[in-house]
Amino acid sequence: MGLVIAVSGLPAAGKGEFATILESNGIPVRSMGDMVRAEVRARGIPEAPQVFGEIATQLRAEHGDDVLAHRLTKAVDDLLVDNPIVLIEGLRGTAERVVFQNHWEGDFLVVAITAPKELRFERVQSRARSEDGDLSDLEKRDAREAGWGLNVIISEADITFGNESNIQDLESRVTAWLNTL
């Protein structure tokens, strides 16, 4: 079996940039956030900043905090047949981490991406995603995701990359790390 890496971090810390770097190195990516966005669309709900968090919370309430992890493991296993490394973008909760750790055991790593709140808000304003809003929305997302255990995931990550500079700096450090795997 290959290696599964899950990237975690607060909104706009740089998880997507990390995923892009790995993808450019031939590593397939599966996004937990994409699963929530697909659920919103499947339910025919208009996209708005609070909707994504509400649906993610609702899914967890209806099916357990680990619902997204269980839904994703088969797709990742399928990718591992032909790929030595697969990335899961957007690990947010301790229940999800437990599912992944139990499923892939020693072949599972957590990477945290960190950035200061002010910089994350600048990024939110520039990327114009439907789940992004104003500073208050970002703070609500931070609090909601902390409630799922995100801060624990970040503090207990196997490796942490600070993302306070530019994309070239992050890419250089991440690529150097990838070359050690």
Language-model features: where?
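Small-molecule kinase domains that catalyze NTP-dependent phosphoryl transfer to phosphate-bearing small molecules
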Residues: 66, 125-180
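Walker A/P-loop
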Residues: 16
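ATP-dependent small-molecule kinase phosphotransfer cores
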Residues: 28-87, 91-99
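Short, well-ordered beta-strand core segments
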Residues: 29, 110, 159-162
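Conserved phosphate-donor/acceptor-positioning beta-strand/loop module used by diverse small-molecule
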Residues: 89-90, 103-131
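ATP-binding Walker
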Residues: 13
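P-loop (Walker A) phosphate-binding loop of NTP-binding proteins
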Residues: 10, 22
